[in-house]
């Protein structure tokens, strides 16, 4: 069985994520960490009658949290709020993630690190560069969790099909739409690229197709607006993060993944088919991209590039737009580590 640590367990994503992973049959020990309230949350969850143990640790006990952890999820950070610029958000969360990943490199160097904190496009490069400097980086062990984009794509695709053609819409099952749609690229705005793999559904959507793309890309804004500035996606993010973590955990047992085309934002140069992926997106120097992954024993062993080999002209446009924006996001993360090392 597997010890899982959640860093940032008291937050809006961290609490429901902790609950969902306490329910997982693949977890034997759940360790919760935050700067406040994690001990109480751990005690609360420990009363649930599943077979995993659960302990919450205070801000001075990160070594105990991480000791022997095989999977570490990082939802820690400041959420999107009105009046907070993206740059403000980045600076705060960049420092938090750098500090936590440094601790993982020190106390759990072989752990698989799942980055949930935003902005994923910049924070995953920070995690990678931090581990590189420590001499602890393993390319298959760092994954940016972009699964919420797929969860939204599955939901919204059925919603739009119901609007356009109720008969076809009623035939669909939102829980298995990952067989007909995947999402690649990055994890913000126009870097998010929904790919409908069942092209007959593109035809069915007709003019709703562009609305579908936009809604998947900017679905998070709906939640910020609906919560009237009091928060962003937390429950749906926790669900998507738990689903992704469960696939990583299943791979420790050599079980077949439940989600077809499960994507993650990964470091391409260190992975099998990474170079091929760079060529197919038209940029041999792009270091990170979210693509379907192949997991073994909790780590990414290769990338599935097949989705890139049969793109429509419109999808190629989406990839080109995403790559331009991703380059800036990635550079921002790398520069943060470079600049902080000069201080």
UniProtKB/Swiss-Prot annotation:
Catalytic residues identified in the record: 187 (proton acceptor)
Any one GO molecular function term = L-malate dehydrogenase (NAD+) activity
Q: Which reaction does it catalyse?
A: (S)-malate + NAD(+) = oxaloacetate + NADH + H(+)
Which residues are noted in the entry as substrate-binding? 80, 86, 118, 152
Q: Per its UniProt record, what NCBIfam families does this chain match? A: MDH_euk_gproteo
Assembly, in brief, is: Homodimer.
Q: What is this protein called?
A: Malate dehydrogenase, peroxisomal
**Native species:** Saccharomyces cerevisiae (strain ATCC 204508 / S288c) (Baker's yeast)
